[in-house]
Amino acid sequence: MAAMRAHARRRHPHALMSRAAGLPRLSWFAGLTWFAGGSTGAGCAAHPALAGLTAGARCPAYAAISASTARPAATAGTTPATGASGSARPTDAAGMADLARPGVVATHAVRTLGTTGSRAIGLCPCQPLDCPRSPQATLNLGSMGRSLDGPQWRRARVRLCGRWWRRSNTTRGASPRPPSTCRGDNVSMIELEVHQADVTKLELDAITNAANTRLRHAGGVAAAIARAGGPELQRESTEKAPIGLGEAVETTAGDMPARYVIHAATMELGGPTSGEIITAATAATLRKADELGCRSLALVAFGTGVGGFPLDDAARLMVGAVRRHRPGSLQRVVFAVHGDAAERAFSAAIQAGEDTARR
């Protein structure tokens, strides 16, 4: 491994891999080609990951590359790759090879297809390998590997992941830079998705119910969940009621495909709700999902039905609560919504959070 890092510094000082929006990054990715048995020709064109990005047909994440441009990196001894006008070339399908040239750093993100989520990979001049991080930081190396094919890359990733986790979660050898210089240290590792879907039919570890404090599921989504779950769900709810505003409790899911239903109290029986209650209820739901060992969770739009809370505001508050959450077992949150307006609201809230994280 030491030889790999030395090789990376000697032959590929410019090739740095990271996750967009401050997600896990590896500063010595350049040596991966040598470690995986690939050749190292001029530049970094032989990297398995870059080859996967260049060959769009092989890389399932290629279609989700966001439009942006490549910019020169401030790397000593390298010359930026530029177009005829002297400006940096765009990272479109024809210009993806520029990612392999010395001195070029990509500013795009490659997102997992089918999500609006926060998991992404890219190239970046940061070196947060030396920054202490939380144990959850390794979650997205697996997501990254699923976006790139090739058995050699997968074998190398496993070795790479173990080494990076040990290095990045100890204070030994840590960089003297303050943690705040590592973009995204406070960004949640949870993958976010938005779907127009019937929450009672989702095959996830847990789904949520926007409930009242008495856990009487009489109207809206709560009534639909109670009907789908069967009488056992209401019986368990009655046993655990009442609960406080912003609190969450779990019951079994009854006849639904999920394992649990997490009931979050967003209002008194028949009463209005507020932004503070929605934020607290979302945070309590996420904590409860971690307590139950859930990896996947469906959230409904809290407070926007009987509670009458504005949809855009609810989306912003709920997405913000998920991004601030430091997950234990939770890896994936699906916002299960009804209607185009709700889908647009939650998608916009997720995108706004990603844009803020990149800045």
Swiss-Prot record:
The lineage of its organism: Bacteria, Bacillati, Actinomycetota, Actinomycetes, Mycobacteriales. Gene3D superfamilies: Leucine Aminopeptidase, subunit E, domain 1. Residues 73-93 are annotated as: Disordered. Signal peptide: none annotated. This is Uncharacterized protein Rv1899c. InterPro entries: Macro_dom (IPR002589), Macro_dom-like (IPR043472). GO terms for cellular component: extracellular region; plasma membrane. Residues 179-354 form the Macro domain. It comes from Mycobacterium tuberculosis (strain ATCC 25618 / H37Rv). PANTHER family: GANGLIOSIDE INDUCED DIFFERENTIATION ASSOCIATED PROTEIN 2-RELATED, MACRO DOMAIN-CONTAINING PROTEIN. It holds the Pfam family Macro. Residues 73-88 have a biased composition (Low complexity).
